[in-house]
Amino acid sequence: MLEKIKIIDTHTHPNIEPLIEEFDDIIFKCYEQGIGLNIVGVDLKTSQTAIQQAKKFKFLTCSVAIHPNDLHNIENDFVALEKLIAENIDYISCIGECGLDYYHEQNYDHDFQKHWFKKHIELAKKYHKPLMLHIRNAHDDAIAILKELAVQDVIIHCFTDKKEYAQQYIEMGYYISYPGVITFKPTKNNQLHELYEAIKITPLDKILVETDAPYLTPVPKRGQTNYPYYVLYTSAFIANLLGITHEKMQKILLENSLRILNFKK
């Protein structure tokens, strides 16, 4: 079944509303188009669902964690999360999405977030899994922690920031995953031209692509619900930006995804 897969959406959420209601149809359309999925949990419930979904087909895998915006019951959730990982280790690609989010200042204290970020890092090391990181307005703190703890296997999810941060992650040997945001129309305010430069300096063996569906729908579907199979719009955009064929770009992205994620051939 995996031999038909041509590309992998490395970060997607068919385990949450509204996509969970369309799961069977989404998976059928993805398989028909040769698209594998890494289904990502953001809390205990969606992590449980991600595992249940990933068990259904070999071209699906999943990531589990507690998102930095969902730490309200973290003490109990984290204990249950580790039990979930231990019992389902073969179906889990990485620990995520976890990390730091300073965008919503009213959510959680920075030190509190950093503590649980470190706990997720410990979990990833214990179970020998990569990290899938959500870092928003917090790159400096995240980089400091990752260096302090000598973290090696990391995917920077949904990277839309400065070229300088991309360069630091590249120097640390991390994978960078680009979302449909890159297909949006450049303006003076969205700094997309700088993001294009980040893509251009990302080594071809460290570049990944994602939808973050149902969010961040790429052009030409922007304004609609995002679906995992829209990942092809983003991969085509990257191919055009880098001046290579879409077929070659998909091959590169697939090889990278299979290298860092847990897909059983």
From Swiss-Prot:
It comes from Ureaplasma parvum serovar 3 (strain ATCC 700970). PROSITE patterns: TATD_1, TATD_2, TATD_3. A divalent metal cation 2 binds at residues 97, 134, 157. Binds 2 divalent metal cations per subunit. The lineage of its organism: Bacteria, Bacillati, Mycoplasmatota, Mycoplasmoidales, Mycoplasmoidaceae. The keyword tRNA processing does not apply. Its cofactor is a divalent metal cation. This is Uncharacterized metal-dependent hydrolase UU017. GO terms for molecular function: DNA nuclease activity; metal ion binding. Its EC number is 3.1.-.-. One of its GO terms (cellular component) is cytosol. InterPro entries: DNase_TatD-rel_CS, Metal_Hydrolase, TatD-like, TatD/YcfH-like. Signal peptide: none annotated. Keywords: Hydrolase, Metal-binding.
